[in-house]
Regions:
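PLP-dependent amino-acid enzyme catalytic core
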Residues: 1-463
Length: 463
C-alpha cells in the first residue's frame, strides 16, 4: 500500500514513511493510492470481534507490508489496553434508533486518544527499527495536544513541540498539556487563534530544508496515520448496527474534518452506506461550503466548544481530492486560491459528488446548551458541548428506520464551566483530571509568527 499526494506532484510513499512525515513535498496531504476493500462477510464478522482484533483487520490493509503483523498487533494491544472501557468505544442507546458512540475512554478523555495512543507506539517502533529520531510538531485547538503528548512523552527517540492558541482552550485542556514536564516535551502558547497555529505548522512542515534537517513529523490529522485508526470505530459501530445489510448514519462534531473523513474512508472501503452529517458550531465554514459551494474563511468566533473554533479545515482537501476524481492539479489550484484569496468555489461536479454523502448542520452554543440541559434532565446523562452539537445535528437529520450515531468526542469534565452553565451543576471529575489542579505548569508564550516558532524549535532540537 502506497500513498500519494492530494496535489499530485509528489512521489508515492509506503505507510511507514508517511507515518513519520508531515505534508507531502508539494504541500498536499497523503492519501491511499487505492482504497482497500472489505467484503460484506468481513464487515459482518467485525461485529463479533474484539476491538483490537477488528483494528488489526482494518489497519493491516493500510500498513501493507510496511509493518509486520505481530508488531502491529502488539502496538494495538498496548494502545487500547490503556482505555477504561473493555470494548474501547462503547455504543450507548439514547432513544429510538439514536445512539452515542463514546470515544472518550482513553487516558486524556477525548477521541484523539484512539489514534494517538497507537500512533505513538508505531512511531517508536519505526524509529527504533531505523535507529532514527524525529521531532514531532503539532497544533491543537484543545485535545490533539494532550493526546499526542500522552502518547509520546518519555520516548528517547522523539521530541514533541505542541502549539495551542493562548487563552482559547479550557483550563483543563491546557493543564493536560502544560503539566507534563518530561524532558522531550515542550508547549507553546501562541498569541492567536487555532488557525494561526495551523498556518505556522504548515509553514514549518512545508519548509523542506527544515523538515529534513530536524526530521519533523506531524501528529495532527494532516498525518494519514492519525486518520487510519479512527476508521476502525466507524466500521465496528456500523457492523454492530447491521451494516452492510442496512444503512447507518453518523453525525460528527468536527472542525478540521479529520474525524468525519475517517467515516468517509470506511464507506470507501465498503463497510457501510449512509449519510455523514457535519456538525459545526458558529465557526461554520464547512456548513456554508456544503450549502453554497463557496469555501470562504471568515472570522474565528470563541464558543463553548473550543476544539471546533476553526475556519480552515485541513482535511477537507482530502474530500476535494476524492470528489474531483483524484484531480491533483485541480485541488492544487483551489488550495492556491484559498491561500491567495481566502476563498474558492467548489466546481459543480465536485459539489454534487460531496452532496451524495454529506449533509451539514450549524448548531449555536445556545442550542448546544439547551441539548445539554435537556439530556441531563431527561436521562441523567452529561454531555460535553462538542458532543451536544453532534447530538443536535443527529436529531435534526435522523431518518425513519435508519440508525443514527452521534459521536461523543470528549468527557464532560474537560469543559466544567460550559457543563455547569447549561445544566446547573459541574460534572463529576475523574481523579486523573482532578489531580491536574495541584501540578506545576510549563509553557512558553510566543507571537503568532512562523519565524519565532521556528527559532524556538531549532533551539529545542539543538539542546
Amino acid at each position: 500500500m502506497n500513498y500519494i499526494s492530494t496535489r499530485g506532484a509528489s512521489p508515492a510513499l509506503p505507510f511507514d514513511r508517511v507515518m513519520v512525515s508531515g505534508l507531502a513535498p508539494d504541500g498536499g496531504l497523503y492519501m491511499p493510492e487505492t482504497w482497500p476493500q472489505l467484503t460484506a462477510d468481513e464487515v459482518r464478522a467485525v461485529a463479533t470481534r474484539t476491538y483490537p482484533e477488528a483494528a488489526l483487520q482494518v489497519l493491516k490493509r493500510f500498513s501493507g507490508e510496511a509493518i509486520p503483523l505481530p508488531d502491529l498487533y502488539t502496538a494495538i494491544i498496548r494502545a487500547y489496553g490503556r482505555f477504561d472501557a473493555a470494548d474501547v468505544t462503547p455504543l450507548r442507546r439514547m432513544g429510538d434508533g439514536l445512539h452515542l458512540l463514546e470515544l472518550f475512554h482513553g487516558p486524556t478523555f477525548a477521541f484523539k486518544d484512539v489514534a494517538l495512543q497507537l500512533l505513538g507506539r508505531l512511531m517508536d517502533w519505526g524509529l527504533t527499527r531505523e535507529n532514527a529520531r524525529a521531532l514531532i510538531v503539532g497544533a491543537t485547538s484543545g485535545d490533539t495536544g494532550s493526546a499526542a503528548i500522552e502518547g509520546l512523552r518519555g520516548l528517547d527517540r522523539v521530541g514533541v513541540v505542541i502549539m495551542h492558541p493562548h487563552g482559547r482552550t479550557s483550563d483543563i485542556q491546557r493543564k493536560q498539556m502544560t503539566t507534563v514536564l518530561d524532558d522531550n516535551v515542550r508547549n507553546i502558547a501562541v498569541e492567536g487563534n487555532f488557525d494561526d497555529t495551523q498556518r505556522i505548522l504548515k509553514d514549518l512542515l512545508g519548509d523542506q530544508e527544515l523538515s529534513q534537517r530536524l526530521h519533523l513529523a506531524a501528529v495532527n490529522s494532516i498525518n494519514w496515520a492519525r486518520i487510519a485508526p479512527q476508521i476502525v470505530y466507524y466500521i465496528t459501530t456500523a457492523a454492530k448496527l447491521g451494516a452492510p445489510d442496512r444503512e447507518v448514519d453518523f453525525a460528527v462534531p468536527t472542525g478540521n474534518f479529520g474525524d468525519i473523513f475517517a467515516g468517509y474512508a470506511a464507506q470507501k472501503m465498503g463497510a457501510f452506506k449512509g449519510r455523514l452529517i457535519v456538525a459545526t458550531n458558529e465557526n461554520d465554514i464547512l456548513a456554508r461550503a456544503l450549502a453554497t459551494g463557496r469555501y470562504a474563511i471568515g472570522e474565528v468566533f470563541e464558543t463553548t466548544s473550543p476544539s471546533m473554533d476553526i475556519q480552515v479545515s485541513s482535511n477537507f482537501e482530502r474530500l476535494m481530492f476524492e470528489a474531483s476524481g483524484r484531480d491533483g492539479a485541480l485541488v492544487s489550484r483551489l488550495m492556491g486560491d484559498l491561500k491567495s484569496h481566502k476563498a474558492f468555489d467548489l466546481p459543480p461536479g465536485m459539489r454534487a459528488r460531496i452532496a451524495e454523502t454529506f449533509d451539514a448542520e450549524r448548531v449555536t452554543k445556545d442550542e448546544a446548551a439547551d441539548q445539554m440541559s435537556e439530556t441531563a434532565r431527561d436521562t441523567g446523562y452529561i454531555l460535553d458541548p462538542h458532543t451536544a452539537i453532534g447530538l443536535v445535528a443527529a436529531r435534526r437529520r435522523q431518518r425513519p428506520g435508519v440508525p443514527m450515531v452521534a459521536l461523543a468526542t470528549a468527557h464532560p469534565a474537560k469543559f466544567p464551566a460550559a457543563v455547569a452553565a447549561a445544566t446547573g451543576s459541574a460534572p463529576p471529575v475523574p481523579p486523573r483530571l482532578a489531580a491536574l489542579e495541584t501540578l506545576p505548569e510549563r509553557y512558553d508564550t510566543l507571537p503568532a509568527e512562523t519565524h519565532a516558532i521556528r527559532a524556538y524549535i531549532e533551539a529545542f532540537a539543538a539542546r
